Amino acid sequence: ENTARLFNASNSFFDNLSEFTSGKEKFLYYLQNDKLNLFVNAAGHIIHGQSFSTETSNVEFFDLGIRARGTVLDHLGYSFSFSKGGIAGSKSLAATVDPRLKYNFKFVEDIENIPNYDYTEGYLRYEVSPADNMLIALQLGREKIKFGYGYGNSLIISGEGPNMDILRFDFRYGIFSFSSIHASTVGEYNDAIQARYSKYIASNRMKVSIPDLFDIGVGESIVYSGRGLEWAYINPLLFYKYAEMSLQDRDNGTVFLDLQTSFIKDFEIQATFFLDEDILSNLQDLDLFSNKTAYQFGFLWYEPFSIGNLSLTCEYTRIRPYVYSHTDYMNTFTAFGVNLGHRIGPNADEILTKIGYNFSSRARLNLEYRHSRSGENIYNEDGTLSKNVGGDVFQPYRYDVDDTHLSFLDGIQHNYDFISAGLRLEPWREIFLDLTYTYSQDKNLSTGNKNVISYLVCKLSIEY
């Protein structure tokens, strides 16, 4: 048997505990029979972050959680998890080391004497296969969402935002697949409870997979708020942009196309084209403010130049001004104040390169370099907006005020360089040690000022 159980009546507790460093898959408890599967794990993390910037600082994280998952009668799947953690040291460094803290309510609220955070996820998923090569599934739960491709970040929904409460429908038959989600989340954090609000995101994606050639998909998303559930957006068999027009054009709609190839062995290409709002008029006038478009393309090459266990990834992303923004700030393409799409935001581009090398099944080296450029809005000394160049997802275009035409990267240009080197070790099964060094530099080309951040993170992860 290749599994170990901490709570196992067949052995003493200490005999079970001795399996901690074994090569077996470990559980607190598991149950398997022809009707029910249940697997329960405990997971904990100890993290130390050390900054080497102008002001040296450090931070420590400690968290512990439980995860349970399984199936009932082969059709109903379930998962449940939660974790709670505390922080000692620099809060600003903590949010740099773990960006998830920027949208964690307990961390942002910051009213307790010890900074802390918590996370919880869970879902129920019912799945059937009524015919060969056919799958139908309905899922209700809370988890992260990722829609679309992207080796660095997806242009559509990156999966790096907060967990959302989701109703999901999936259908697959042969080469055709379709997914539809309706999710709820929240807006920016506000100290005043009455100013907090919920918002909703609906998205559909249809994909055709041609074996050994490519997968091609088309999809759409809608962000809306200020009211309860909009029944039109719960219907998966509807073109949301046209439905949004019939609902008096209050919401933020996007459309996207994406492609992933498989016709070259060990070499994969991904590409995405993203259209925000205006999808028909003036597409030939690329500098018009309403042409809120973005595109991304890249490749993954496994064992390039016949170098075993090596992977090489390159990707370019370009996002025009005002993408992800909306005339109603509550309908921006954000959750808890964090951009749901690509991290660089509007009026920006990025070149990304990743190299991964497996020394063995228990040791992996990861190297990453990113160079991005962004054009930021110009503000007066008193904080008022002087020139809007579409560089802020929360600052929409102002009719009769802002320029109707603008160049890409207009405004105050920043060049950002990011370098990361990480080593992951698994000395024993499900016990991981991660060592990561990060260096980043943000240069304001108008003033020549630089903001440099460098830090080392040591992370111990244990699951039993």
Predicted regions and their residues:
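Outer-membrane beta-barrel channel domains
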Residues: 1-215, 221-226, 287, 291, ...
